[in-house]
Amino acid sequence: MTKRKLHNNWIIVTTMITFVTIFLFCLIIIFFLKDTLHNSELDDAERSSSDINNLFHSKPVKDISALDLNASLGNFQEIIIYDEHNNKLFETSNDNTVRVEPGYEHRYFDRVIKKRYKGIDYLIIKEPITTQDFKGYSLLIHSLENYDNIVKSLYIIALAFGVIATIITATISYVFSTQITKPLVSLSNKMIEIRRDGFQNKLQLNTNYEEIDNLANTFNEMMSQIEESFNQQRQFVEDASHELRTPLQIIQGHLNLIQRWGKKDPAVLEESLNISIEEMNRIIKLVEELLELTKGDVNDISSEAQTVHINDEIRSRIHSLKQLHPDYQFDTDLTSKNLEIKMKPHQFEQLFLIFIDNAIKYDVKNKKIKVKTRLKNKQKIIEITDHGIGIPEEDQDFIFDRFYRVDKSRSRSQGGNGLGLSIAQKIIQLNGGSIKIKSEINKGTTFKIIF
């Protein structure tokens, strides 16, 4: 099916609506004007006919002259006087006036008739005349030539007005539709550019139409979300390719070792299988963390948000950690004030364990970790402090980047992927919080989480 252009369709529709509206309007106006003018012509004819009748009542018939009759007539009028026997007594008509023969026709026709003669319409009014010395009737012939000319002029004016109005409407519609469709054309072209070149540019439309500007803003927001989703997917692929390469190479190497020696040497088989399983577990954990970072539900927090009692959650997690790491000392300094926050419970547990796990990894000597909470200026503050190796100042701006490791020589042996702090930062930001870091080499690190 052939699709029509919105631009052309708009012009056609608006022009047709305008034309039909003007056409109907002109017809109504002409109808009322014709009726008014026709009634005016009829009134003039009847008035003249009445004046003729009054003339015959004012003086004897023998004293009435043609001059008297003409004085009672208006423009474009003639008069014929008949006696009661249909004999013509007076006539002011000429050769160009409609002929009305005496006899049956005008004896019995209605008082007012309309006849056409030589292309001109006439009104003929029959008026009885009865006086003391005369009995007959008059036929007043009123030409409608002037009326017809006025009506014709009205039709011509209406037609000219309709044509001019249609042309003006079509021109205005063309200009207006161009302004309306121009942003849509720009939108279409921008989509083509994005499909071809990517998300480098935004749609810039400066119009006087709120709807068009809202459309452009919505489009830009949609493109930003699509770009973010696209970048997340690309980042996931890049990160996965980068981090999966090493464990996959290790697994491949041990599988080759099993194929070559493991069939005959149980020790080699056992060792290679254990290492392969360990690397597979590392891959699974890595993929889970990558998926956590690339989730797109940034704005969908409130649907599962619950009231989290911070101090209660920390006490519960610390109790479990003491059982899991009996060689570590966990000190707590929790405020007596009730600290609450709206968020998904598993997210709070996840980010808290990320910081504790990070402290355990890098505090292998003193093995002393402190957790402190307080309320300041309506802000809920959580501080997690270790006494480990610390973070160099030049590294502190990058520790939340994906796969960034401060102690690069030890991170793989400690099982880290460099994603934990990135995940924690994302959770904190999604819930309207912020994070600060304070660290000194060989003295320890404090992470301050603020909600």
From Swiss-Prot:
Autophosphorylated. The keyword Cell membrane applies. It is found in: Cell membrane. Keywords: ATP-binding, Cell membrane, Kinase, Membrane, Nucleotide-binding, Phosphoprotein, Transferase, Transmembrane, Transmembrane helix, Two-component regulatory system, Virulence. Its main location: membrane. Residues 178-231 form the HAMP domain. GO terms for molecular function: ATP binding; phosphorelay sensor kinase activity. It is a multi-pass membrane protein. It catalyses: ATP + protein L-histidine = ADP + protein N-phospho-L-histidine. The keyword ATP-binding applies. Residues 239-451 form the Histidine kinase domain. Pfam families: ArlS_N (PF18719), HATPase_c (PF02518), HisKA (PF00512). The chain crosses the membrane at residues 11-31, 156-176. Member of the two-component regulatory system ArlS/ArlR involved in the regulation of adhesion, autolysis, multidrug resistance and virulence. ArlS probably functions as a sensor protein kinase which is autophosphorylated at a histidine residue and transfers its phosphate group to ArlR. This is Signal transduction histidine-protein kinase ArlS. The gene is arlS.
